[in-house]
């Protein structure tokens, strides 16, 4: 396996360019587990390719770059097992050199090959100044006066979550739309002062799986109508693309695939995703799958020769997570 030198590799010390990864660094494998780098080789590759997926993400490497390839038969077997329990036919990494001469579409024009998304990434537990649920709710619900409002139907749940972390709820007036204003003691913005964040800090995005699920739960309860029961789909909207991209990274680190759409009439970006872990009581998602989701390969195209980096780990398959979407490669 070799990825191009400028590809970003997820490490325990945040993202690193592939050409900056060193022996002894800790990275993450296809199952989201921590593994250690034992070999790094730099070389110039004359035959390089760019792989494009159906969510417009790309990854570049030489012809030896490998993916866990799912074909139509494999996906049919997953459906037969209802995507809940594994079966005997295990996926193996397939190199690009074995794919570049194949058609990526079947006779009906449907995309043939897909790769599974990573499992939730096992970042270490963090010592966070504000509990994840409380922080996520506060960050995306507060007004300029640092007041919050309850969401109709979830007031008792929200109050209980805050109280379970030692916060006293002080209620204000109830609005005509059913929302009630409230503040907390201690005040969250005073706990964070003087550096009050306007976006998700890195230590929250790199917290443990349980902490990130709690963070996402708080964010999804912070506004009304963020879950579409009919489509079993969550959404998060903002006019700030950087904010949406942060939530996208949070969701994808938990194994889900996402998409972002722009509404020019409202000048708003909306993140859409499905999430198999239950974070809202009205959620009707099916059980967790063998693989949380999948990306379809839309194109494999030659690109210019360039420096590449071959990385081996002490894991059983040398898999690592690369780039946006935490794409698993080998």
Give short role names for the model-derived ranges.
Residues 1, 23-32, 39-270, 295-330:
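Intein-associated homing endonuclease modules of the LAGLIDADG/DOD-type, together
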